[in-house]
Amino acid sequence: MRVKDPEIGSPAKKSMSAVTDIEVVDSHTVKIKLNTSFADFPLLLTDYRLRMIPSGSGDTIGQTGIGTGPFIVDKFDAEGTTILKANPDYWEGAPGLAEVHVIAIPDGEARVQALLTGQIDMNRYVPFAQKKIFDGNSKFNTTVVPTGNWRGMVMRTDTAPFDNPKVRKAVRMAVDRQELVDLVMGGAATVSCDTPVSPSDQYRLNMNCDQDINGAKKLLAEAGYPNGIEMTIHVSTKEPTWPTIAEVMQQQLAKAGIKADIQMTPSKSYWKETWMKKAVAMTRWNERPADSILHEAYHSGAKWNESFYKSTSFDKNLADARGELDFDKRKKAYQNAQKTLWEEAGTMIPYHVSKLVVTSSRVKNLDEVEVFSVRWHKVKVD
């Protein structure tokens, strides 16, 4: 199974660790064997990164595709323009578009300008602060899509002073999440108390986490920092809202004696040279089922454990949750994991975003859902 190959380094490897064997029963059936009880395993298989593909195609399928979708790869250029041509034999019917061009534009501001000038017809990552640019303009349509995606700030728990859980919690307590929702997202987001679990997920733990400056100062003093701490937040425009989030947090943290400097870094190299490299950096994740996101972002052995958080009791909690067949007990276990994150986590998650999608008014029949669920064969352009 390719996803479990350590040389591949898939972030979904930890989530699929329970799978021991996959047996082909017939042309439409497979039998999956697990080494433990896993009540929600069918949910895991809905992950957008898990696919059944032809044997031996793993190294090339990302560039070539296999021709079963509504569009076929004609030209692949990860740093330029990838061209997709309509698949006339698509099982749900021929697409309404002859071609789709996917243009790589790493910088958020540049993407907005490309939309305004007509270089592109759709931008699914427009900051809400720029919504007014498109509202009332007959050349564009705007759509707000609620999601479980989140933006935040990650502190490496293996690096001082963030190796002290009291310091990490103090930083998180000093943040006014509702103010971030209002100022950064224009109200179009759902407050999170540092849980990565989507607001719509059945295991979501809803908590109150109002800003607590006195509590933050108290924790810093207990940790040996009565005069506060200094930190540098590494930011880029890879995610257009990151600079604004950092600027708002800078003012909020100062109230608790936390001096935060902001350092801009190149967007193009952010994931390779900043994220999981610097002591404090901005982060973003797409929605996943509760079990997947808790394993991928926080389990001790996870490749994308961005805060380097390690806790044997937390790992055991997740294992117990997976194997619990009683729904109420399973829910309690997943929620206990989220309570632990509120106390100990290195990642500050202020909110889950509603996504602002802006398209040219020429684009028709675009589903108001996340990109992975769009029925692309129905989309047309006048």
Which residue stretches match the model-derived regions?
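Alpha-helical secondary-structure segments
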Residues: 1, 27-33, 69-70, 97-99, ...
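Ligand-site clamp/hinge motif
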Residues: 2, 59, 87-133, 250, ...
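Surface-exposed binding/hinge segments that line
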Residues: 11-54
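Gly/Pro-rich hinge or "lid" segments in bacterial periplasmic/extracellular proteins
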Residues: 27-28, 45-95, 99, 109, ...
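Extracytoplasmic/peripheral linker and loop segments enriched in polar/acidic and small residues
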Residues: 166, 255, 259-269, 295-361, ...
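Structural transition elements
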Residues: 190-222, 239-242
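Ligand/substrate-recognition segments at binding pockets and active sites
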Residues: 201, 221-287, 327, 355
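Long beta-strand-rich cores associated with HINT superfamily self-processing modules
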Residues: 357-382
